[in-house]
Design a protein with these regions (language model features):
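Conserved helix/coil segment N-terminal to the catalytic DExD/H
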Residues: 1-34, 48-52, 56
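Loop/turn-to-beta-strand initiation segments
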Residues: 8-12, 31-34, 59-63, 78, ...
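Hydrophobic beta-strand scaffold positions of dinucleotide-using enzymes
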Residues: 14-16, 66, 130, 263, ...
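Conserved P-loop NTPase motor "coupling/switch" region that bridges the ATPase
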Residues: 34, 42, 51-135, 179-182
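Walker B catalytic acidic pair
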Residues: 38-39, 336
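SF2 helicase/translocase ATPase core recognition
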Residues: 44-47, 57-98, 142-171, 296, ...
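Conserved Helicase C-terminal RecA-like lobe
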Residues: 144-162, 170, 182-313, 319-320, ...
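C-terminal accessory region of SF2 helicases/translocases
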Residues: 188-191, 368-510
Length: 510
């Protein structure tokens, strides 16, 4: 192949993206019959080196395989389509003017009737063009072969300590920005630092404490809000709303059944807190993060999936192992914090609901009520709705969020049980009670408006564990839905309800 004349002994080459880039010049010299790119969304940016290297192949037959062709915006979708069918959607500039701009304006929560009409027309036109080269298979296929998956979006109240630090961070950032405007200095790096502080604070105050102690930290003045005894305990679930909910869920599960957990976070510092919690409660655990070799990862995954293993929790770094791992030894997964990219969260949450799973699965997404986490989740919802319209040709996908609302990242909404539910303008809930059920056909892929909404009444929550901890004092709202319908015998459901009644000392405990 190196000289372009000798026929390869083996007609198929299996190669990673990284290795391909190393040998791109050699591979460019030969005519290739077909290229198949798994995890095709890695080519979402036409400017990156991997895309350009693959695009240089002498190959007319190109196939991309991806579960998430749209992760953030329509230009990513354009890049994928343009790779397999160059010119089908015009140039990037033409695509933006002809399709992206009218579609996005039409999807805005404040769009006029005329803008919605133009957006729908542009969407239909684009779908007509690309459907000639796209075969779409959704996760609905899995429902024929896998047990039921129950998804829960759990809004958790911050503690008073978290709220006070959160508001001080916002006030300080406003002052810092005003000073930077006067000095005409750039604020991009400081803005990212501010966002990171808010996100970590939502997980646990300990995650920002050490950073704030540094004398050059721009938020150093938040230190006086911490109690003198703050560092007395390495892990104190009572100082974090989400950690408190996690602690309750793990405790009730451990007490009532033999289910195991995967705990996922984007931050290794948070995983450190998981470790301390497991030690505090005496839970067996294994941990996977970016410091592990491939052999080490395979070993601990095999160990955890062994039915005879004693490990109760698998502690997983989303960035290190959110893709490709099969963790069917657990059937419960807690996504402790959100990512900006919905595809990353979806990949991580798919670790337990996979081929070989025999138990019903329970997914819990924890969000700090009214915080930047709910705003991030709203952005995820907006992006997924866009994907539903464009990729899956979804009909009547609701427009819940305007572009202006999605920019309101930093305001802390302390008076609402869920900022997301408030922005849905839900017509099925009256005074915190769901007055009518979603349609029977609704599932985990449906619009949030078609999920169950539980604020004051936990009886409709299918998961007996979450029903049991609903009144722990830290949960303000729960969205919940299932992957598909199965009939549960009435007698069995009554037995579950009886088995998982909250203990008197748990209910209402703070």
């Amino acid at each position: 192949m190196a000289d372009g004349r000798v026929r390869a002994a083996s007609p198929v080459l299996i190669i990673s993206y990284e290795t391909f880039r190393l040998y791109a010049k050699i591979l460019h010299s030969s005519v290739i019959g077909m290229v198949i790119c798994d995890e095709g969304h890695r080519l979402k940016n036409s400017d990156n080196l991997t895309y350009q290297a693959l695009n240089g192949l002498q190959c007319e037959r190109r196939v991309l395989i991806s579960g998430t062709p749209i992760q953030n915006d329509l230009l990513e979708y354009y890049s994928l389509v343009n790779f397999v069918n160059p010119g089908l959607l015009g140039t990037a500039g033409e695509f933006k003017k002809r399709f992206e701009n009218p579609i996005l304006r039409g999807r805005d929560g404040n769009a006029t009737d005329e803008e919605q009409k133009k957006g729908e027309e542009a969407t239909k036109e684009m779908i007509t063009l690309v459907e000639k080269c796209i075969i779409r298979r959704t996760s609905a296929l899995l429902t024929k072969y896998l047990p039921v998956k129950y998804e829960h979006i759990v809004c958790c109240r911050n503690t008073e300590l978290q709220d006070s630090i959160y508001n001080r961070l916002i006030e300080t950032e406003k002052q810092n920005r005003a000073m930077e405007r006067e000095k005409e200095t750039g604020a991009t790096a400081s803005a990212l630092s501010f966002i990171t502080h808010l996100k970590k604070l939502c997980n646990h105050p300990y995650l920002v404490y050490e950073e704030l102690q540094k004398s050059d930290n721009r938020f150093h003045n938040c230190l006086d809000l911490f109690p003198d005894s703050f560092l007395a305990k390495k892990c104190d679930p009572s100082t974090s709303g989400k950690m408190k909910v996690l602690d309750y869920i793990l405790a009730v599960t451990r007490k009532t059944c033999n289910d195991k957990f995967v705990l996922v976070s984007n931050y290794t510092q948070t995983i450190d807190q998981f470790v301390e919690l497991c030690k505090l409660r005496g839970y067996g655990y294994v941990r996977l993060d970016g410091s592990m070799s491939i052999k080490q990862r395979a070993k601990i995954v095999e160990k955890f999936n062994d039915p005879e293993s004693s490990e109760f929790c698998f502690l997983l770094s989303s960035k290190a192992g959110g893709c490709g791992l099969n963790l069917i030894g657990a059937n419960r997964l807690i996504m402790f914090d959100p990512d900006w990219n919905p595809a990353n969260d979806d990949q991580a949450m798919a670790r337990v609901w996979r081929d070989g799973q025999k138990k019903n699965c329970f997914i819990y997404r924890l969000l700090a009520t009214g915080s930047i986490e709910e705003k991030m989740f709203q952005r995820q919802t907006h992006k997924k709705a866009l994907s539903s319209c464009v990729v899956d040709a979804g009909q009547d996908v609701a427009r819940h969020f305007s572009s202006d609302q999605l920019k309101e990242l930093f305001k802390l909404e302390t008076e609402t049980p869920s900022d997301t539910h408030m922005r849905l303008k839900c017509k099925r809930c009256i005074n915190g009670i769901e007055s009518s059920d979603p349609p029977e056909t609704a599932d985990c892929t449906s619009d949030l408006a078609l999920w169950h909404h539980s604020q004051r009444d936990a009886r409709k929550i299918a998961d007996p564990i979450l029903r049991s901890v609903f009144n722990c004092g830290a949960i303000s709202f729960v969205f919940h839905q299932k992957s598909h319908n199965v009939e549960v015998p009435k007698k069995k459901k009554e037995e579950d309800d009886e088995e998982y009644k909250p203990c008197e000392d748990e209910e209402g405990e703070d």
